[in-house]
Curated annotation (Swiss-Prot):
Keywords: ATP-binding, Ligase, Nucleotide-binding, Purine biosynthesis. It comes from Halorhodospira halophila (strain DSM 244 / SL1). GO terms for molecular function: ATP binding; phosphoribosylaminoimidazolesuccinocarboxamide synthase activity. Pfam families: SAICAR_synt (PF01259). Transmembrane segments: none annotated. Pathway: Purine metabolism; IMP biosynthesis via de novo pathway; 5-amino-1-(5-phospho-D-ribosyl)imidazole-4-carboxamide from 5-amino-1-(5-phospho-D-ribosyl)imidazole-4-carboxylate: step 1/2. NCBIfam families: PRK13961.1, purC. This is Phosphoribosylaminoimidazole-succinocarboxamide synthase. It comes from the Bacteria. Belongs to the SAICAR synthetase family. Its EC number is 6.3.2.6. The lineage of its organism: Bacteria, Pseudomonadati, Pseudomonadota, Gammaproteobacteria, Chromatiales. The gene is purC. InterPro entries: SAICAR_synt/ADE2_N, SAICAR_synth, SAICAR_synthetase_CS. It catalyses: 5-amino-1-(5-phospho-D-ribosyl)imidazole-4-carboxylate + L-aspartate + ATP = (2S)-2-[5-amino-1-(5-phospho-beta-D-ribosyl)imidazole-4-carboxamido]succinate + ADP + phosphate + 2 H(+).
Length: 295
């Protein structure tokens, strides 16, 4: 298996498969650890697309690990130092090399922590309707891609594969996970976003918004899980191409979303196939985001 061979699905027999998500396959190592393998699957509008993107899973893993290390002083994360090759059979090592991580086994919270620094995507659509995003009132007169006065926390539900995440207010988040956890994940998410924003800007990138996911320890402590500040979970823009009122080119899934929108797809399975050129350009955008962030 080479880096250029897309990995749409893993086939690890030495560990039990617990879950196959939009991008990641999750295996049980033991009662306290999981093996998470980022495949090259790509989802858009909560639908898995039929064509994998070469090397995407490895890029996501490297970028996530970069951010997990960079933000470890702000928030606990699920990453362990165990090499993924050490928990699978020798003949399966190629499947996890560069794209697998061994992590703490935690209870996932049923919400996703979205932080927005700019008005884009579904946030812009919501603002156009009623001037709010996830119950957060914003000033009048903002334009698409405008920088917000300050970053805002706009959580969503955590949908099953094939379903859509739905925006919820902070009060609804409290109803789902309790006031203490809701406050803590909001604080952590905003602090991580602030650090990442400052760093990315020094590299010529804008992080318009991002999604964090959290688990909890048996003691009730929040821990960042899944991925962190990747091109799948974030909207990255080149700073020199940003201007309010327009959508900048993006180093993330927005290129695919725009392509699918142009096709007139109804955003329901099955998704249309991607052309070879779209696959190639998407792979290059992921690699470029990694280069700019981690060089």
């Amino acid at each position: 298996m080479t880096a250029s061979t897309p990995v749409a699905q893993t086939h690890i027999q030495s560990l039990p498969l617990l879950h196959s998500g939009k991008v990641r396959d999750i295996y049980a190592v033991d009662d306290e650890r999981l093996l998470i393998v980022a495949t090259d699957r790509l989802s858009a509008f909560d639908v898995i697309l039929p064509d994998p993107i070469p090397d995407k899973g490895a890029v996501l893993t490297r970028v996530s690990n970069f951010w997990f290390r960079k933000t470890a002083h702000l928030a606990a994360n699920h990453l362990l130092d165990t090499p993924p090759e050490s928990v699978v059979a020798p003949e399966e090592a190629d499947q996890v090399r560069d794209r697998g991580v061994v992590v703490r086994r935690l209870q996932a919270l049923p919400v996703e922590a979205i932080v927005r620094g700019y008005l884009a995507g579904s946030g812009w659509q919501s603002y156009q309707r009623d001037g709010t995003v996830s119950g957060v009132a914003l000033p009048d007169g903002l334009r698409q891609s405008d920088r917000l006065p300050e970053p805002i926390f706009t959580p969503t539900t955590k949908a099953a594969v094939g379903d859509h995440d739905e925006p919820i207010s902070f009060a609804q988040t409290v109803e789902r996970i309790g006031a203490d956890l809701a406050e803590r994940i909001r604080t952590i998410a905003l602090e991580v976003f602030a650090l990442a924003t400052e760093y990315a800007e020094s590299r010529g990138l804008i992080i318009a918004d991002t999604k964090l996911e959290f688990g909890v320890t048996p003691e009730g402590e929040p821990v960042i899980i899944d991925e962190l500040l990747t091109p799948d979970s974030s909207r990255f823009w080149p700073a020199d191409a940003w201007q309010p009122g327009a959508t900048p080119p993006a180093f993330d899934k927005q290129y695919i979303r725009d392509h699918l929108e142009a096709l007139g797809w109804d955003k329901r399975p099955p998704a249309p196939h991607l052309t070879d050129d779209v696959i190639r350009q998407t792979a290059e955008k992921y690699r470029e985001a990694e280069r700019l962030l981690t060089r």
